[in-house]
Amino acid sequence: MDFKEKQLSSKLIYDGKVVKLYVDDVKCPNNNISKREIVKHNGGVCVLAIVDNKVILEKQYRYAYDEVLYELPAGKLEINEDSYEAGLRELEEETGYKAKSLINYGKMYPTCGYSNEIIYLYVAEGLSKSQRNLDEDEFIDIEFVEIDKVIEMINQGIIKDAKTICLISKYLLANKK
């Protein structure tokens, strides 16, 4: 079966700083016409950094959920920015650690039902202490947590962030003994 839908029309509803919202008319595989509300986003990066056998976790308030969340260092891609370079930049800006290199752990689609956002996943190598340089609207605490404790935090629902859970899981699966 051909699952692909054909776009018939697209209307920009909202053009924001971070996202654009479109309402598209599509022709479904069964020839029915349907609407798709699509959030277009430039994408982001997520970086797992381990210092002295401890994972760098960030703790920050997330307005959309009205709660403080634990996450791995991450951030938005600038327009036409390479995800590898963005990973290096975000890690240093948010944590004050500079990576010599990043290992590509693939990508994830965090909200595939209604958004085109892609988050690129990396693991940092060759870390050295540098300087934090947070954006003026970022307020982030850094914690260094043993990997076993991170797994426990995921299993207990303390870590809820999808990109963080995804990258930690991929890392553990790739490095299981």
Which residue ranges define each predicted feature?
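Conserved Nudix-box catalytic region and its N-terminal flanking loop in Nudix hydrolases
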Residues: D2, V45-R89, R132
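Nudix hydrolase/Nudix homology domain
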Residues: D2-E5, V68, I79, D137-K177
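Acidic, metal-coordinating catalytic segment for phosphate/diphosphate chemistry
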Residues: S9-C46, V51
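Short, solvent-exposed loop/turn elements at beta->coil junctions and helix N-caps
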Residues: K11-L12, G106-T111
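A generic structural signal for well-ordered coil/turn residues at beta-strand boundaries
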Residues: D15, K20-Y22, G43, S115-I118, ...
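Active-site-adjacent beta-strand/loop module that shapes the phosphate/pyrophosphate-binding cleft
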Residues: Y22-P29, T111-S130, E143
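Short loop segments at secondary-structure junctions
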Residues: P29-N30, V51-K54, Y61, A124-K129, ...
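The catalytic Nudix box helix
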Residues: L72-N104, Y122, L134-D137, E146
